[in-house]
Amino acid sequence: MKKSLIALTLAALPVAAMADVTLYGTIKAGVETSRSVAHNGAQAASVETGTGIVDLGSKIGFKGQEDLGNGLKAIWQVEQKASIAGTDSGWGNRQSFIGLKGGFGKLRVGRLNSVLKDTGDINPWDSKSDYLGVNKIAEPEARLISVRYDSPEFAGLSGSVQYALNDNAGRHNSESYHAGFNYKNGGFFVQYGGAYKRHHQVQENVNIEKYQIHRLVSGYDNDALYASVAVQQQDAKLVEENYSHNSQTEVAATLAYRFGNVTPRVSYAHGFKGSFDATNYNNDYDQVVVGAEYDFSKRTSALVSAGWLQEGKGESKFVSTAGGVGLRHKF
């Protein structure tokens, strides 16, 4: 009898130790096709087409917490890409951290979403192709090796500050500072995310200083309807051009509505003429993405989307079209 009790207790120990650990993830893949045409005068200078089986951002993660008493908890997470196309490797290459949570809010250190990235619901698309999501306005979003503080919510308002150290920014790049806030009232919401970096090497022989970005998102989100608009401004001084001041403004909007198991969705983005890292590159664009999701269950959905992107106008425009179908399962 004693031996049976001892064996039962030993068998239960791993279960108890894992009680606050959660395994989660998403597996999603599909087929995408695209066609891009670069124009030179009245003729197409180049045409590129492609069709392939792609991973749409699969991930797997482990997270947990421990109650330390007096309302304080230790929290942790390790999350990684898990491409079923076999193109990703390594641990912790997505959001991974350790920290503390309590009445004061949440303090974490590790590879963390930037405050700007947490305003990224304006681009809800599951895609590999840049033409099947509003990815140009979303390009500055990142995960940073950093320390981040998130405040508790007061009357629907919460805030975040984040600091990425100089030695973690990579060669030729400085530390960066990030801040933002969220406000929710019923289904209505307002979000702001911004960042500042003293200097940054965009590429070889392209260096910028006093880079800053600001994004404001506002909209409505409930169980059936999601609608949002965003405006984003990037701004910097280009070192190689006598510290000339350069900027670009972008706007985007997304609308989705759930009808039973089907959720149709449409997004539009526009980039005004200008570029924060060049003086002679207009970088204006228009982009439209339409699509829908069909939920087989709470965890499994079918995806379909089509996209169009035009960069520039007139004789030197670049036009791309794309389409995709996929399947997503959450666990």
From Swiss-Prot:
It is a multi-pass membrane protein. Keywords: Cell outer membrane, Ion transport, Membrane, Porin, Signal, Transmembrane, Transmembrane beta strand, Transport. It holds the Pfam family Porin_1. InterPro entries: Gram-neg_bact_OMP, Gram_neg_porin_domain, Porin_dom_sf, Porin_Gram-ve, Porin_Gram-ve_CS, Porin_Neis. GO terms for cellular component: cell outer membrane; pore complex. The keyword Ribonucleoprotein does not apply. One of its GO terms (molecular function) is porin activity. It is found in: Cell outer membrane. GO terms for biological process: monoatomic ion transmembrane transport. Residues 1-19 form the signal peptide. It comes from the Bacteria. Gene3D superfamilies: Porin. Transmembrane segments: none annotated. NCBIfam families: porin_porB_Neis. Belongs to the Gram-negative porin family. Serves as a slightly cation selective porin. Homotrimer. This is Major outer membrane protein P.IB. It comes from Neisseria meningitidis serogroup B.
